[in-house]
Amino acid sequence: MAALRLLASVLGRGVPAGGSGLALSQGCARCFATSPRLRAKFYADPVEMVKDISDGATVMIGGFGLCGIPENLIAALLRTRVKDLQVVSSNVGVEDFGLGLLLAARQVRRIVCSYVGENTLCESQYLAGELELELTPQGTLAERIRAGGAGVPAFYTPTGYGTLVQEGGAPIRYTPDGHLALMSQPREVREFNGDHFLLERAIRADFALVKGWKADRAGNVVFRRSARNFNVPMCKAADVTAVEVEEIVEVGAFPPEDIHVPNIYVDRVIKGQKYEKRIERLTILKEEDGDAGKEEDARTRIIRRAALEFEDGMYANLGIGIPLLASNFISPSMTVHLHSENGILGLGPFPTEDEVDADLINAGKQTVTVLPGGCFFASDDSFAMIRGGHIQLTMLGAMQVSKYGDLANWMIPGKKVKGMGGAMDLVSSQKTRVVVTMQHCTKDNTPKIMEKCTMPLTGKRCVDRIITEKAVFDVHRKKELTLRELWEGLTVDDIKKSTGCAFAVSPNLRPMQQVAP
């Protein structure tokens, strides 16, 4: 305590301008730096900022889709013509912008990401054997990056247990003639408190290229809205962190409590010359078209049944499509806190045209709004909420569901590569109720509810309820399905004919419920 009192008294006296520090007597801190020397170096030329990124380097590139990507630093990498990069990114965006430009220029050898999405260039290079692709669950990727920055070499997670992530064998590289050349390795598995967890290793990079909103001249950085995403953890997990921002302000412009990334993590800063801030999925609030076809009628039926799963005060994560549309039917008297994996709690409706903001998107890359009381955070925090069981409900689509609740929705090997995104994380917590919404059969009338999934799993024995346009099933992870509700006009025999496994019929079977329009 005496030392702390002495320290406070010395700091209270101040330091003469130009002084190099204060020497304290033995046993106390030796000096207090007051020189203007800072860790962060400021640049005017983005090419100069990245010119020492060499061939074969590992580079983290911040952003989520196109939101919060370092546009100017990516353009600078194109000009340096560096090649054989190993890129770590949440996903690969689109073909003609952002990370897609590096792929088009053949500068990337390997990508570690969670989602390919609609980037057909990435998918085609991967399937042709021209690109290595290590697909990693989004929350696991965020935590691997966070661990790398925190000096934690590895950690255990429930995400991916019972899937190719744990078992190994996920395709990383194909030969030009379509054969597997490189596959993922199995993970070590341990059991804690009766649940299974797999060992994941931390990631560090040679460089991190990050997009902030503002930086002060000390190198402290703040981000805008949902553009924190992977930018924040990546700042902390590279040997050299280069940040581009829209504005540079004087030291003291940010209240200390408002700084998102302290300057200890920042090595280089530049003010971006220009920003396109392209929006991947511009989505505007509009009245629904009342002219719905047969398929839309089926979707509406699922949506209106799914809306009955919401409870007042719950925290929920909704996948794109039917799950998100179900939120339109939440009663005005009910409060449901909607969570988005890219770092939002308190999602509101889609924006009007004058509310559109490129820095405010959901996990489906759609423009959104945030309700009063909503908040933003980085991707590692977002998935801590998910893995930690703080989300009561997750609702998502599926390609296949088994009678024991196995879920497949992320890949058709050799044909369709989307990536798991955050789905594996969302279904990994034992505390979260998982509801699947989907059409009962494929377009060729093949059942999607099956004895056993034939596609790679997203989660093992993780689904609690299935809602289709024909029926509602409850899933018992050690027994068969139970038919709970049936659409009017259909019989149990109709459901048996369109379902690929046996199921029990509830003694309290009732007509399929619908929320009031």
From Swiss-Prot:
Biological processes per GO annotation: ketone body catabolic process; ketone body metabolic process
Enzyme Commission number: 2.8.3.5
Localization terms from the record: Mitochondrion
Pfam families membership: CoA_trans
Principal subcellular localization: mitochondrion
Top enzyme category: transferase
Reactions catalysed: a 3-oxo acid + succinyl-CoA = a 3-oxoacyl-CoA + succinate
Molecular function via GO: succinyl-CoA:3-oxo-acid CoA-transferase activity
Pathway as given in its UniProt record: Ketone metabolism; succinyl-CoA degradation; acetoacetyl-CoA from succinyl-CoA: step 1/1
Record has Mitochondrion as a keyword: yes
Active site: 341 (5-glutamyl coenzyme a thioester intermediate)
Superkingdom per UniProt: Eukaryota
Tissue expression notes: Testis specific.
Keyword annotations of the record: Mitochondrion, Transferase, Transit peptide
GO CC annotation: mitochondrial matrix; mitochondrion; motile cilium
Transit peptide feature range: 1-39
SMART domains cross-referenced by the UniProt entry: CoA_trans (SM00882)
Listed InterPro entries: 3-oxoacid_CoA-transf_A, 3-oxoacid_CoA-transf_B, 3-oxoacid_CoA-transferase, CoA_trans_fam_I, CoA_transf_AS, CoA_transf_BS, NagB/RpiA_transferase-like
Subunit-structure text: Homodimer.
Its job: Key enzyme for ketone body catabolism. Transfers the CoA moiety from succinate to acetoacetate. Formation of the enzyme-CoA intermediate proceeds via an unstable anhydride species formed between the carboxylate groups of the enzyme and substrate.
Family in the record: Belongs to the 3-oxoacid CoA-transferase family.
Protein name listed in UniProt: Succinyl-CoA:3-ketoacid coenzyme A transferase 2, mitochondrial
